Amino acid sequence: MSEEKIHKIILVGDGAVGSTYAFSLVQQGIAQELGIVDIVKERTQGDAIDLADATPWIAPKTIYSAEYSDAKDADLVVISAGAPQKPGETRLDLVNKNLKILSSIVEPIVESGFNGIFLVAANPVDILTHATWRMSGFPKDRVIGSGTSLDTGRLQKVIGEMEHVDPRSVNAYMLGEHGDTEFPVWSYNNVGGVKVSDWVKAHPEVGENKLEAIHKEVADMAYDIINKKGATFYGIGTALAFITKAILNNEHRVLPLSVPMDGEYGLHDIHIGTPAVVGRHGLEQVIEMPLNADEQAKMEASAKQLKEVMDKAFKETGVKVRQ
C-alpha cells in the first residue's frame, strides 16, 4: 500500500495573523507538518507546543519551531511577517519597511532549496507578492498573494446580511488592490442570478445609495477593526487556511487572489486582485472578469496607484531582485 502524501507548510511570521492561520490549519486538519519561523524564537516554540496541545481532539500534526533551512522540502511557504498596520495608516504606508523585511525572508528561503509555492499575506500584499516573485526568481505560477480574498468575504457577508441569505450563496467579488482603491463588481455581483444592484432597486427601503454604502463599509472595515482592537487576524487567518486547502488538495478552485497581470484588464508587470484558479501546482489560470467602463477605470486607477508606490519603494529600498 502506497504511503499518503505528507503536506508540509513553513509559516514565516508568528504574529496575530500567523498564529491565527496556524490555529486554523490545526482546527481544519490541513497539512500534516507545520514549521513556524519568527524573529522571536521563543514565541514559535511556545506556539508549537500550544498548537500541538489542540491536535488530540482533531488530527495528528507535527508542529515545531523552524528555521529557514527547513523550507527545503516544504510544499508551501506562507509569509505573514511584517510591520503591522497601525491606526491611521494605510496598507501602502507599510511598503518600505515591509519590503526590507521581505527581502530578509525570501533570500534564505530560496537558498534552502525550496521548490514549492509562496503564499504571501503580509501588507501591502499586492506589492509584496510581486516583490516575492522578483526576489525569488520563481515562475509566476508559484507566487500567489491573498489579494482580495478577505475583502470579497466581507462583501459577501454584508450582502448576505442585507438580503437575508447565507454569505456562501452570494456570488460577489472585490477586485483591485487589497486596500483603499479596491472596488465591488456590481455589474456581476449577484445572489441566485439576480444582480445585487437590481435587488436594491426592488427594495427601496434599503436606500438608493446602498451600493455606495456597502462599498465604503467593506473598504473601511479593516480600519474599523484596527481602531477598536488593534489588528485584524481572524478573517485573514481563516481565508489563508481556505486558500491553503485549495492548493494542497488540488481543488482547482476559483478564488480572488493577488496574481500577475499579463495583459488582463490591459495591465502588465503588476500583481493585483482578480479571480484565479489554484491547485497543487499553484496558479493555474487568471480570470479576467468582464467589467463595465466605470469598473475598468477603477481597475486601471487601482493598478496605477500600486505601480507608482511599488516602483518608488523598489528604488528607495534598493532591495535585491532576481528578475
Swiss-Prot record:
Binding site for NAD(+): V17, D38, R43, Y68, G82, A83, S104, A121, A122, N123, S146
Keyword Cytoplasm: yes
Positions of modified residues (Phosphotyrosine): Y223
Highest taxon, organism lineage: Bacteria
Pathway this chain belongs to: Fermentation; pyruvate fermentation to lactate; (S)-lactate from pyruvate: step 1/1
GO molecular function: L-lactate dehydrogenase activity
Reactions catalysed according to its record: (S)-lactate + NAD(+) = pyruvate + NADH + H(+)
Annotated binding of substrate, by residue: Q85, R91, N123, P124, V125, D126, D151, T152, G153, R154, T232
Gene Ontology CC annotations of this record: cytoplasm
Record localization: Cytoplasm
SUPFAM superfamilies assigned to the protein according to its UniProt record, in alphabetical order: LDH C-terminal domain-like, NAD(P)-binding Rossmann-fold domains
E.C. designation(s): 1.1.1.27
Active site annotation, chain numbering: H178 (proton acceptor)
A Gene Ontology biological process term: lactate metabolic process
Keywords associated with the record: Cytoplasm, NAD, Oxidoreductase, Phosphoprotein
Similarity comment text for this entry: Belongs to the LDH/MDH superfamily. LDH family.
UniProt-listed NCBIfam families: L-LDH-NAD, PRK00066.1
Role according to the record: Catalyzes the conversion of lactate to pyruvate.
Subunit field text: Homotetramer.
Protein's name according to its UniProt entry: L-lactate dehydrogenase 1
Lineage summary: Bacteria, Bacillati, Bacillota, Bacilli, Lactobacillales
